[in-house]
A protein has these predicted regions:
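Boundary at the C-terminal end of the N-terminal hydrophobic targeting segment
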Residues: 19-23
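Bacterial N-terminal signal peptides
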Residues: 6-17
Length: 399
């Protein structure tokens, strides 16, 4: 009798395990990702935020994907390998395909520049995606431009967003936001994965922000200066342009600073109908671009009146060497993070200026217009920064 009961109990245990395994199967409501190349059916995304891949590699011995905790890929009779991710955060994610130990882009995905190379990415639909969706509203232009920088004796490449009415009313002049990408990315980032143009188009159409120009340059180190090291000390910003990020990685901003101040701003003012003064000029950036913004705006209060730091540190009261001048010249300090970044080593790391919430509160107490924004349920990723731009833009250039 005991043996029978044991067998029954064992059968129930197996049944429970089987049911659990079944409930972990992906929900079968797959749709092609919006980030796919034209006509490609994979990758696909379901309502759980899981991503399904199908890679045709009939001679491969193994296939996988760079997302952690993904399922093992299985090979079908047609030579195609299929695998799934865990549920991912809403928004944009870079990835690579691994075939027999070699990392390659997914031939089904559009290509985006990230991790210092062109590669694949997938868009997981977000509940709040409406603010960066393509709608039937007037659209601005995202212009790809080459220009020559005398300070570095180099040809430069940039993108400039002009608002929908820019070409209709040729007597109107506009403020400018200088918007910087993160480490491992380039000047294409905000226009492509960041959806900056669509965000501004929609905000302008809804009457939530004044029209302004966005100028996007490469913030890396393209002409032979020192590369990132592990030895540079943290600084408090201001005129010293070497800044230590998480893990002691040092970023040297002096080369970009010279191009920005001596070449890029004069080029934009000389070739677009800008309001070419400090009250109508802003700077913002994500991650490394936020660190650049923090450092360079503190060093050039005569150039920028609005400051946006997205996941790139914050400004402490002790960073401000001339409080009277700062109060007079700076109209806004905006700091943002994804909620899943806060309290992590990325925020607490050297050179990030301390607790961002506390720093914003201290700036407010000192009489400086300061805003802290926390993107819900996101980490150090593009969904945090898209939302940050949405929150930042309506605060700019108020009379």
């Amino acid at each position: 009798m005991r043996t029978k009961l044991s067998l029954i109990a064992f059968a129930f245990a197996l049944s429970g395990q089987y049911c659990t395994a079944q409930t972990n199967e992906p929900v079968n409501d797959w749709k092609p990702a919006s980030s796919n190349q034209q006509g490609k059916q994979y990758p696909q995304v379901n309502s759980e935020g899981r991503v399904k891949f199908r890679i045709v590699a009939p001679k491969a011995q193994s296939v996988g994907v760079s997302f952690r905790d993904s399922s093992a890929f299985t090979k079908g009779e047609d030579g195609a390998w299929v695998g799934y991710t865990r549920p991912l955060d809403e928004g944009f994610h870079y990835y690579t395909i691994n075939i027999d130990g070699g990392e390659v882009p997914d031939p089904n995905s559009q290509f985006f520049y990230g991790s210092s190379r062109w590669g694949s990415a997938v868009e997981v639909p977000a509940k709040d995606a409406d603010f960066y969706s393509l709608k039937n509203v007037p659209h601005g232009h995202l212009r790809e431009i080459h220009y020559f920088a005398k300070s570095s004796n180099t040809n430069r490449h940039c993108f400039v967003y002009t608002p929908p009415d820019y070409d209709q009313d040729t007597t109107k002049h506009y403020p400018v936001l200088y918007l910087q990408h993160g480490a491992g990315e380039d000047e294409t980032g905000w226009g492509r994965q960041g959806c900056a143009g669509l965000i501004l188009d929609n905000l302008i159409a809804e009457g939530k922000t004044k029209p302004f120009i966005i100028a996007m340059e490469f913030g890396g180190n393209p002409f032979g200066g020192p590369r990132p090291t592990n030895t540079a000390p943290a600084t408090t910003g201001g005129t010293n342009s070497t800044f230590a990020g998480p893990g002691g990685r040092a970023f040297t901003f002096s080369a970009f600073e010279k191009v920005l101040i001596d070449d890029f701003i004069p080029f934009i003012d000389g070739n677009f109908r800008t309001i070419a003064d400090q009250p109508h000029r802003a700077m913002a950036g994500l991650s490394m671009g936020g660190m650049q913004t923090r450092s360079l705006t503190l060093a050039h209060l005569d150039k920028f009146s609005h400051i946006g730091v997205f996941s790139g540190g914050s400004i402490a009261v002790t960073n401000i060497t001339d409080m009277a001048a700062f109060k007079e010249k700076v109209k806004l300090v905006f700091v943002s993070y994804g909620s899943r970044e806060l309290g992590t080593n990325r925020v607490a790391g050297r050179g990030f200026g301390g607790d961002p919430k506390a720093n914003v509160a201290a700036l407010k107490a000192a009489g400086i217009n300061s805003v802290f924004y926390e993107s819900p349920d996101t980490a150090h990723e593009w969904q945090s920064w898209r939302r940050s731009l949405r929150e930042f833009a309506p605060l700019l250039f108020k009379d």
